[in-house]
């Protein structure tokens, strides 16, 4: 929505097709251009179909935001099974690889583009999630930096946003995607309660989706043309402590 408010046409790819349609409808009702696609970001065919459809409907791909992600139930290595490990890695890391690879296929021939990957403060330390989530987000940070080194000279900037505690439905959405084999995540993790947030976040509150959207919009803008390979931490000062 924030990118659309700035004048960008937006294509939304979501496993929940209704959610993608809702986003596209909100944008078009506000006077913007949008297209919705249902698909799995961890499957190359779905990503290719969505990007190809978006380019056909909306024009050249200028910005790719790899935002899909799920939690892992906060399982440690001795608790998580291989199936859950692979599913989390597929969505949280392989999805970023696939989205970036498909975006580069359009951006590199034109010599311009912006890729913004959603990482996490869990990708910068050993807390903030279970084993699979922390490993995947570290992978996103590393992949972002490697791609920036390789492709920035060809006109494509590549950065990551690392949110701290944010007011979202990520726990509930993760639960719905992963199914009943994952424990209730509503009370698990760091900074679950308001009291915990105040104790670990100097700003004294959770962040909002608008806080994250502002960071994404900056990294996607012309003003950020010399910013690449950067991990922008948006955590209310959590990691500064």
Where do the PLM segments sit?
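Substrate-binding pocket helix/loop in short-chain dehydrogenase/reductase
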Residues: 75-77, 81-89, 115, 197
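Alpha-helical segment proximal to the catalytic Tyr-Lys
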Residues: 105, 149-150, 225
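Active-site helix of classical SDR
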Residues: 100, 136, 144
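Short C-terminal tail/terminal secondary-structure segment
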Residues: 71-74, 125, 216-217, 228-241
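Canonical Rossmann dinucleotide-binding motif of NAD(H)/NADP(H)-dependent dehydrogenases/reductases
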Residues: 1-11
């Amino acid at each position: 929505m924030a990118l659309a408010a700035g004048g960008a046409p937006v294509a939304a790819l979501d496993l929940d097709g209704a959610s993608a349609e809702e986003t596209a409808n909100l944008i078009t009702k506000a006077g913007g251009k949008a297209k919705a696609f249902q698909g799995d970001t961890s499957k190359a065919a779905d990503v290719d179909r969505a990007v190809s459809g978006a380019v056909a409907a909306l024009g050249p791909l200028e910005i790719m935001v790899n935002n899909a992600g799920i939690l892992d139930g906060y399982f440690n290595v001795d608790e998580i099974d291989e199936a859950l490990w692979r599913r989390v890695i597929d969505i949280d890391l392989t999805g970023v690889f696939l989205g970036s690879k498909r975006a580069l296929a359009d951006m590199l021939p034109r010599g311009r583009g912006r890729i913004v990957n959603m990482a996490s403060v869990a990708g910068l330390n050993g807390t903030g999630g279970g084993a699979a989530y922390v490993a995947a987000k570290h992978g996103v940070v590393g992949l972002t930096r490697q791609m920036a080194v390789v492709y920035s000279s060809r006109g494509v900037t590549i950065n990551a946003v690392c949110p701290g505690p944010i007011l979202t439905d990520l726990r509930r959405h993760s639960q719905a995607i992963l199914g009943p084999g994952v424990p209730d995540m509503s009370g698990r993790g760091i900074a679950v309660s308001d009291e915990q947030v105040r104790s670990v976040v100097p700003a004294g509150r959770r962040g909002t989706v608008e806080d994250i959207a502002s960071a994404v919009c900056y990294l996607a803008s012309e003003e950020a043309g010399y910013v690449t390979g950067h991990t922008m931490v948006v955590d209310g000062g959590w990691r500064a402590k």
